[in-house]
C-alpha cells in the first residue's frame, strides 16, 4: 500500500510539473506572437504612410 501511495504521489507531482512547464512555454509563445503582430502592424502603418505620400498615378519602376 505504501508503494502505491508513493507511486501515485510521484505521478501527480510529475504531472503538475509538466503542466506548469507547458503553461510557461505557452505564455512565451503568446508573447512572441503578440510581438510579431505589433511589428507587423507597425510595418503596415509605415507602408500606408508611404502610399499617402505618393500621388495615385505614380508607379514605381
Curated annotation (Swiss-Prot):
Positions of the propeptide removed during maturation: 23-53
Biased composition (Basic and acidic residues): 36-55
Native organism: Pithecopus azureus
GO biological process, one term: defense response
Family from the record: Belongs to the frog skin active peptide (FSAP) family. Tryptophillin subfamily.
Keywords, comma-separated and alphabetical: Amphibian defense peptide, Hydroxylation, Secreted, Signal
Annotated signal sequence range: 1-22
Name of the protein in question: Tryptophyllin-T1
Modified residues annotated as 4-hydroxyproline in this record: 56
Tissue specificity annotation: Expressed by the skin glands.
